[in-house]
């Protein structure tokens, strides 16, 4: 998997891990992961009110690595109660143009640099992920993707709401 990710984005040293956890974590596990794994950043998504424990330690974290929030907010009124969370993030990745507009308005009194609030479309590249035409095409894809290795268990997550978000 790492070779595929590295090749796709043109780097040679990515590290991808999924660490199962019940709930949204806690300060001890984040400290442990920062110490052991030495990540380049923390990326989180979902309502920031689920992450109050993370934001309580944001100064401690941000002395070592940045906090990145992949955020969504679809509708008015402006979520002013999220302002302090947004201010505590080093980078806000907005799932839609509407989200970007809302975030920028919430931060009007505390504007961030242009690069710190970015529109990152929600979805997948339909030139890479598309319905396969036949079984042979699927077998060729599997051979190439898995590099000839056999796996007992493979997960593919597909989300279909891209058109609604952009």
Feature map (PLM): residue ranges:
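N-terminal strand-loop element at the rim of the active site
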Residues: 1-28, 32, 117
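Short N-terminal targeting/anchoring amphipathic segment
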Residues: 19, 31-51, 66-68
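An aromatic- and histidine-rich active-site surface loop
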Residues: 42-61, 76-84
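Short hydrophobic "strand-cap" motifs at the C-terminus of beta-strands
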Residues: 70, 95, 120, 157-159
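Carbohydrate-associated surface elements
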Residues: 98, 123
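Conserved donor-binding/catalytic core segment of Leloir-type glycosyltransferases
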Residues: 148-165
């Amino acid at each position: 998997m790492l070779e595929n990710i590295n090749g796709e984005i043109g780097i040679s040293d990515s590290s991808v891990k999924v660490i199962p956890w019940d709930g949204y974590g806690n300060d001890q596990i984040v400290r442990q992961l920062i110490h052991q794994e030495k990540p380049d950043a923390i990326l989180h998504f979902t309502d920031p009110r689920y992450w109050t424990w993370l934001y309580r330690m944001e100064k401690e974290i941000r002395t070592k690595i940045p906090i990145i929030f992949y955020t969504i907010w679809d509708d008015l009124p402006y979520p002013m109660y999220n302002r302090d969370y947004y201010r505590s993030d080093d980078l806000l990745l907005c799932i839609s143009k509407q989200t970007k507009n809302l975030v920028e308005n919430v931060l009007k009194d505390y504007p961030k640099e242009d690069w710190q609030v970015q529109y990152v479309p929600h979805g997948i590249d339909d030139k890479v992920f598309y319905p396969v035409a036949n079984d042979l095409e699927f077998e060729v894809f599997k051979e190439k993707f898995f590099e000839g290795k056999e796996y007992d268990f493979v997960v593919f997550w597909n989300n279909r709401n891209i058109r609604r978000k952009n």
